[in-house]
Amino acid sequence: MSIPPESVIPSLHESVADAPSAEQRQWAMFAHLSALLGAILTGAFGGGWGCFIGPLVIWLIKKDTMPFVNDQGKEALNFNITVAIAFVVLFLLTVMTLGIGLIITIPLWIIIGICWLVFTIIAAIKANEGVRYRYPFTLRLIK
C-alpha cells in the first residue's frame, strides 16, 4: 500500500495561503522591535519595564484580528518578561550578598543584555520574513 506523494507534501497553494500577510509580518516585527524602543526610551536594556510595554500594547491591540501578530506578540512579551525576571533575580542576589555577588552578577547582566539584544533583532528579522520565531530560554507565561 503506497501513499500518493501529493498527500504527504503540501501543495504550494496551501503553504502560500497559510503565510501571514505583509501587514501581519510588519506588525509582528514591530512587536519585537518595540522592546528595543522601550529600552532606549527608559534606558534599561533587557530588564526594564519599558521592554515589555511595547510588545504588550501591540499584542493587546492586534491579537484578535491578526493570528501571526498574536503569536509573535506573545512570544516577544514572554521573552521580555523572562529577561526582566532574570534581572530581578540577579539584583536580589547582589542585595542578599551585600554587594559581593556583583562579581557574578555584573558579567551575567552583560551576557544576558547582549543575548537579549541579539535575540530581539533575530526575532524581528524572522517575523518580517513570516517565520514564527521562538526565543530560547523563555518562560511561556502568556499562552
Residue ranges of predicted features:
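Hydrophobic transmembrane alpha-helices of multi-pass, membrane-embedded glycosylation machinery
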Residues: 54-59
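Residues at secondary-structure transition points
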Residues: 21-24, 47-51, 63, 67, ...
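Amphipathic, cytosolic membrane-interfacial segments at TM-TM junctions
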Residues: 61-84, 125-135
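Low-complexity, intrinsically disordered extramembrane tails and loops of integral membrane proteins
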Residues: 1-24, 140-143
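Hydrophobic alpha-helical transmembrane segments in multi-pass membrane proteins
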Residues: 28-53, 78-120
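A generic hydrophobic-segment detector
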Residues: 117-143
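Intrinsically disordered, low-complexity boundary segments flanking structured domains
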Residues: 15, 46, 124-128
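Membrane interfacial helix-start motif at the N-side
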Residues: 16-22, 26, 34-38, 65-80
